[in-house]
């Protein structure tokens, strides 16, 4: 959730170095499989839930992969299969999608099905009543809070009653990036699920990195250091409130437009909008990616080949323990769009946006 797209940018950069990693001697590389297993078992927030009632299957997987590595299988391909078994889009390495059941079961390759799929930040009038804000990333390196507020100011100055917030392609970043948009759509106090850390050295390092200079962060670190490794940190609030001191009179009606690439912080935006905005309807054809139950990721380099990486979530949503996780199926839209995919999605006003604009006018 937090900082995911920045992490993925690092991943892309690291991936460009993989050819050098292919030269790692097989005997040394094999220990990187053991490294992956160790860090998953002691630090991955999803490990207890993903292995529950599947202990024999998990043990057999590890044994088979170790035997295949000993027989000459590429170590890092085996690591990809190992991580893919957990079926978590936040737990990954190069090549994991080929083994992750969800990626195989629910492909969302819009680029292959459309003439051009490259959603870009844009804002413009759709028609006399409707304004479009396209917000395809929560990465603060891609868009600043000032730029987000400027888009909102342009919308309010337009005089349009209705708003389409198009987040197709938004794979995440940082939750704070969308806060001005959430404030704009807010019309009542809402409650959303919190998250909890699975205590480990990596989780402590994560808190220290992002909140270690705050009193609250230091207090959390102290409690984590008193908690046995592998347990979830007790005493955390299971929910949090979404509350602002005022409600914007516009938009009168709003649409949140999603697709199967929306994940992580993008999905958090969907959940928070649903929790606090009755005037907003979620539109889409596909469910979202389903990449939010386990989050707050750390990037790790393999000790034997430091050009290779793995990404690991340190927190679990409190909804998981209650059986309300979203990762298996993603978040469904309120209204399913049955139109064909648009030919192009860049900075244009596409067919879906025009259809949604008309539908907003017909709502009671």
Q: Where would I find each of the regions flagged by the language model?
A:
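A recognition module on extended beta-rich or small alphabeta surfaces enriched in W/G with H and D/E
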Residues: 318-338
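Mature hydrolase/peptidase catalytic cores and their serpin-fold inhibitory cores, especially
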Residues: 226-242, 251, 262, 286-287
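Active-site neighborhood of thiol-dependent amide/isopeptide-bond enzymes
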Residues: 255-266, 283, 291
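Flexible, low-complexity junctional segments that flank or bridge functional domains
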Residues: 22-223, 238-239, 250-255, 276-280, ...
């Amino acid at each position: 959730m937090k900082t995911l797209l920045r992490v993925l940018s690092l991943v892309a950069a690291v991936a460009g170095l993989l050819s050098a990693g292919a030269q790692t001697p097989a005997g040394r590389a094999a220990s990187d499989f053991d490294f992956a297993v160790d860090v998953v078992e002691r630090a991955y927030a999803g490990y207890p839930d993903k292995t529950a009632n599947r202990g024999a299957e998990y043990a057999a997987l590890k044994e088979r992969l170790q035997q295949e590595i000993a027989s000459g299988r590429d170590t890092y391909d085996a690591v990809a299969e190992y991580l893919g078994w957990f079926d978590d889009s936040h737990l990954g390495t190069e090549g994991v999608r080929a083994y992750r059941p969800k990626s195989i079961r629910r492909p969302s390759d819009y680029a292959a099905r459309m003439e051009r799929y490259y959603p870009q930040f844009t804002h413009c009038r759709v028609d006399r009543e409707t304004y479009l804000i396209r917000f395809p990333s929560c990465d603060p390196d891609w868009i600043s809070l000032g730029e987000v507020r400027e888009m909102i100011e342009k919308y309010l100055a337009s005089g349009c009653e209705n708003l389409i917030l198009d987040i197709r392609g938004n794979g995440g970043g940082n939750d704070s990036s969308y806060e001005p948009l959430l404030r704009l759509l807010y019309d009542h106090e809402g409650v959303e699920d919190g998250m909890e850390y699975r205590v480990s050295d990596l989780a402590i390092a994560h808190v220290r990195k992002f909140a270690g200079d705050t009193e609250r962060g230091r207090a959390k670190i102290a409690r984590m250091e008193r908690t046995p490794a592998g347990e979830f940190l007790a005493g955390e609030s299971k929910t949090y409130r979404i509350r602002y001191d005022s409600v914007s009179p516009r938009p009168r009606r709003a649409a949140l437009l999603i697709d199967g690439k929306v994940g992580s912080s993008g999905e958090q935006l969907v959940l928070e909008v649903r929790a606090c905005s009755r005037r907003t309807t979620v539109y889409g054809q596909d469910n979202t990616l389903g990449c939010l139950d386990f989050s707050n990721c750390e990037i790790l380099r393999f000790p034997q080949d430091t050009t290779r990486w793995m990404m690991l979530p340190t927190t679990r949503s409190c909804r998981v323990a209650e059986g309300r996780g979203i990762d298996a199926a993603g978040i469904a839209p309120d209204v399913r769009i049955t139109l064909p995919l648009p030919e192009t999605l860049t900075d244009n006003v596409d067919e879906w946006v025009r259809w949604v604009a008309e539908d907003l006018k017909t709502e009671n």
